[in-house]
């Protein structure tokens, strides 16, 4: 009697929202306390009762194999009402099972317990398990895509798809500088040439105002020579306008100037160079610097960009990227913070420092390489 009352109570929890198109007549059942066990069959056979008080079915939103015994009974009651089936033909003593047991029942077993309704139950179970599996796969795929998109958002800069630095940073080969005499041969490994996968995703630290940069930099006329006249015709010594460049696209440097900066490469030299080596080689060759950068403290490895956009343009020419800007270049430089090749000098705009894992910039190293 108690088991029958429990089943009667379960049958009161119908829900038709998921099947509203075909279950508009699905009725709720009054609480078990309002009728006795003898009223169970009558209740199941009377679908014309009020829809008021309909509750969400407990089995919705879960995969059938994870249903509890209560959820299984709830689902069976729903199918009875949906198919207008005579509940008196069901052997309820054999309905005491959880979802895993129900899913393992063969078609013949369901027919034995539920009669003709067994075919419908078997088909519905198959559809539910199939749709659950498809939905789970879809959710996993969506999460994987979202995870990758989120990671890209957290890790801007050189790893952005289409980034001008991606190929340079992901090069497997060890790339030596074509400017540095000590690295033009078969080439000792460069500190910046190891596989980028070892650097992790911590390369992209939050941008500092000193990194966001800009092309407008006050240039002290005593800070060195300016660009050659063929590269920047209006920047002549003594010109009162040369101290501060106007806003706008940087002037295009001549092919002769770029050829001079790049120098003659050995046919065995690796293609390209790393960004930090490119910066280093500008600094250690004053004859090629032409006012692009200067040492702030040579002993400590501290340097400053004087013509930030011009340096970015040179790097863009080397990488065949006409859209290069200092903002993009400074983002790529942050990749080297994690590897301690470059460091940011806090509180100083356009000022950076070579880290402990950099090489080839110290005076003794330069002198040794030239001997």
Curated annotation (Swiss-Prot):
GO terms for cellular component: chromatin; cytosol; Golgi apparatus; nucleoplasm; nucleus. GO terms for biological process: blastocyst development; cell differentiation; extracellular matrix organization; inflammatory response; mammary gland involution; negative regulation of DNA-templated transcription; positive regulation of transcription by RNA polymerase II; regulation of transcription by RNA polymerase II. Keywords: Activator, Cytoplasm, Developmental protein, Differentiation, DNA-binding, Inflammatory response, Nucleus, Repressor, Transcription, Transcription regulation. Residues 173-251 are annotated as: Disordered. Residues 231-241 have a biased composition (Basic and acidic residues). Expressed exclusively in tissues containing a high content of terminally differentiated epithelial cells including mammary gland, colon, trachea, kidney, prostate, uterus, stomach and skin. It holds the Pfam family Ets. This is ETS-related transcription factor Elf-3. It comes from Homo sapiens (Human). The gene is ELF3.
